[in-house]
From Swiss-Prot:
Species per Swiss-Prot/TrEMBL record: Pneumocystis carinii (strain B80) (Rat pneumocystis pneumonia agent)
pH relationship of activity: Optimum pH is 7.5.
Name this polypeptide is given: Sterol 24-C-methyltransferase
Coiled coil regions, renumbered to chain: none
The UniProt record lists the keyword Lipid metabolism: yes
GO cellular component: endoplasmic reticulum; lipid droplet
Superkingdom of source: Eukaryota
Temperature-activity profile: Optimum temperature is 37 degrees Celsius.
């Protein structure tokens, strides 16, 4: 796959973020933040994102603009998170990833355990300098820094998320341990051999080329250092010639800003090709978990374990999704929410439905763990 990456205009991106979200946007959280967005900037982000998908909010497969999604993946992903970050925080708090669930384990405990698990496998130690590739709003970085005592640098190409990550780290008293830097993980703004350890949690899926992002991770990791990743990949049961499988995959891609999801073998081959030694490989989605990783997306009230779970899962029932979508549509109609807010919510529902289908068919995992070493020589 050959394509030229776009150049990142850091100042232009920062100015757009301040216009759309406001300079003090980090102090607000969740859907309440949506009421204060600049409506014209929101429309620009919306038109830009859906323009890469033929302006459709559907899981119906459309590959017309796929090459543009590869070349301009940074713009695609940046505007996606301009649009969905508030929705993510509303539904998922500050750690935007899936996890396994132990018996009677709360959502926050399960999320933290998943983060501790990758930190343990990466061998992260106190005082080390660690890179979080695609750090979101900093939830995992905060948790892993507290767990290990490491100094963590979060890399992100979305200014709004960086603003929020800095706010959360300050609020937790971790400003001296955490830094958040604007940058493209396909073109990292760091010299060679900068980090003792590196991890990524469901982030490199946004890359137009896994070989490209892995080569950058390899470049900035110190010789002998470890890289651990939770990767989204298609499993061996996936049949790329099956129309139903194709539709499910496309629903995940359009709903999660993914240029193309790789197969598990392709991702592993990319790690090896850039020079990594794979020292541990583990597919976690069906391992030692009484509940599926998509538990909170499925809307199955029969599996509810607590009243708190009931509130979260009720939102994902058919009637719950309809009520929330209708409310957002009404707020948009009367002008309290920016135009396109319902469209954003609807595309997230497409993603959720597609992820659940993929999980039930066991053709996809969001938690293929690889631990890799960069050779000393």
């Amino acid at each position: 796959m050959s394509f030229e990456l776009e150049r990142i205009d850091i100042e232009k991106d920062r100015e757009f973020s301040e216009i759309m979200h406001g300079k003090d946007a980090a102090k607000e959280r969740g859907l309440l933040s949506s009421f204060r967005k600049d409506k014209e900037a929101q429309k620009i982000a919306l038109d830009s994102y859906f323009g890469f998908w033929g302006d459709k909010c559907t899981s119906e497969k459309n590959d017309i603009h796929q090459q543009e999604r590869f070349k301009f993946y940074a713009t695609l992903t940046r505007h996606y998170y301009n649009l969905v970050t508030d929705f993510y925080e509303y539904g998922w708090s500050t750690s935007f990833h899936f996890c396994r669930f132990a018996k009677d384990e709360s959502f926050s405990q399960a999320i933290a355990r998943h983060e501790h698990y990758i930190a343990l496998h990466a061998g992260i130690r106190e005082g080390e300098t660690v890179l979080d590739v695609g750090c979101g709003v900093g939830g995992p970085a905060c948790q892993i820094s507290v767990f290990t005592g490491a100094n963590i640098v979060g890399l992100n190409n979305n200014d709004y998320q960086i603003q929020r990550a800095k706010y959360y780290s300050e609020k937790k008293g971790l400003s001296d341990k955490l830094k958040f830097i604007k940058g493209d993980f396909m073109q990292m703004p760091f010299p060679e051999n900068s980090f003792d350890k590196i991890y990524s949690i469901e982030a490199t899926i946004h890359a137009p080329s896994l070989e490209g992002v892995y080569s950058e991770i390899y470049r900035v990791l110190k010789p002998g250092g470890l890289y651990a990743s939770y990767e989204w990949v298609m499993l061996n049961k996936y049949d790329e010639n099956d129309p139903e499988h194709q539709q499910i995959v496309y629903g995940i891609e359009i709903g999660d800003s993914i240029p193309k999801i790789s197969k598990i073998g392709e991702a592993e081959a990319a790690l090896i090709k850039v020079g990594f030694e794979i020292i541990h490989s583990e597919e976690l989605s069906t391992k030692n978990s009484p509940l599926p990783w998509y538990y909170y997306l499925d809307g199955d009230l029969r599996k509810v374990r607590s009243f708190r779970d009931f509130i979260s899962i009720a939102r994902m029932t058919t009637i719950g999704k309809w009520l929330i979508s209708s409310f957002i549509g009404l707020m948009e109609f009367i002008g309290l929410l920016p135009k396109g807010s319902k469209k954003v919510n609807d595309i997230l529902l497409v993603a959720a439905d597609s992820l659940v289908k993929a999980g039930k068919k066991e053709i996809f995992t969001p938690m293929q763990l690889w631990v890799c070493r960069k050779p000393l020589v």
